[in-house]
Design a protein with these regions (language model features):
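N-terminal Rossmann-like or analogous alpha/beta NTP/dinucleotide-binding catalytic cores
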Residues: 1-119, 205, 216-217, 221-234
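Active-site cores that bind ATP or allylic diphosphates and position pyrophosphate for catalysis
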Residues: 106-234, 240
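Hydrophobic alpha-helical segments, chiefly the membrane-spanning helices
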Residues: 243-245
Length: 245
């Protein structure tokens, strides 16, 4: 007998709950109820500059007003940064990441200068400027005090993955994994020791989430999350994704 499905609603307390948040919460709660599953509430508060305690208090009050219930305790990402650090360390050890010293201005300039910059669903992709730096070059720039982010080397991730990996989306059916769809995404920054892509993947795995509901705007992010999950968190399999329109 299979265990009950586990779903999560994971808002960021960067402002008051808006209608889209409320709809997403109600949708996820309804799916969990219909499937006889569990609903988790996770506070995604890794952006310490924008997230505020008063917004979290208001968010919880609004969810209570909507009549929603969830499993306890509530997981707050800011309290579990070590989990993300451990996941990132493992990816680093497996040579699936690299430091990127480019500023946003430099990236935009390189994209503008390229004859045919690679594009993904959300626009131009990072051109890979720092991907092929030597170890000595990277070490020298670090020792020189240059700020850097950590990016996923999606080409290496693709080679690590078995061909034909997929997941099921309830709206669009079987989805074949494309590890390079979003390019070399940022997994951690100097000011925030993780990123949305890394934190959400790690937390879903640790919390045993089996079904994910998300908006159309995040549909293609599933490729990034499955890439990180399959290469690092191989034991965790999310059954399916449901798009909340």
């Amino acid at each position: 007998m299979r265990n009950s499905p586990i779903l999560r609603f994971a808002p960021s307390p960067t402002g008051r709950l808006h209608l889209g948040n409320g709809f997403s919460a109600l949708y996820t709660f309804d799916v969990a109820r219909r499937l006889g599953g569990k609903l988790l509430l996770r506070i995604e508060d890794i952006d310490l500059d924008r997230c505020r305690p008063e917004y979290e208090v208001a968010l919880l009050a609004d969810l209570d007003w909507l009549g929603l219930t969830w499993e306890r305790p509530v997981r707050r990402q800011s309290e579990h940064m070590d989990d993300c650090a451990a996941a990132l360390a493992r990816l680093n050890e497996e040579k699936l990441t690299y430091p990127c010293f480019c500023t946003r201005k430099q990236i935009a300039s390189e994209i503008a200068a390229a004859a045919s910059a690679p594009h993904g669903p959300d626009g131009a992709l990072y051109p890979g400027t720092c991907r092929n730096l030597t170890d000595d070059e990277r070490q020298g720039r670090r020792e020189g005090g240059e700020a850097y982010a950590i990016r996923l080397d999606c080409a290496k991730a693709r080679k690590r993955l078995s061909p034909g990996l997929s997941w099921y989306d309830r709206s669009r059916g079987k989805q074949l994994l494309n590890a390079e769809l979003h390019g070399d995404v940022v997994l951690a920054r100097k000011d925030i020791r993780t990123s949305y892509h890394l934190a959400v993947t790690v937390d879903d795995a640790l919390q045993g989430v089996t079904r994910v509901t998300r908006g159309q705007d995040l549909f293609v992010s599933s490729h990034v999350h499955r890439s990180v999950s399959y290469t690092h968190l191989r034991a965790h399999e999310t059954d399916s994704y449901l798009v909340c329109r």
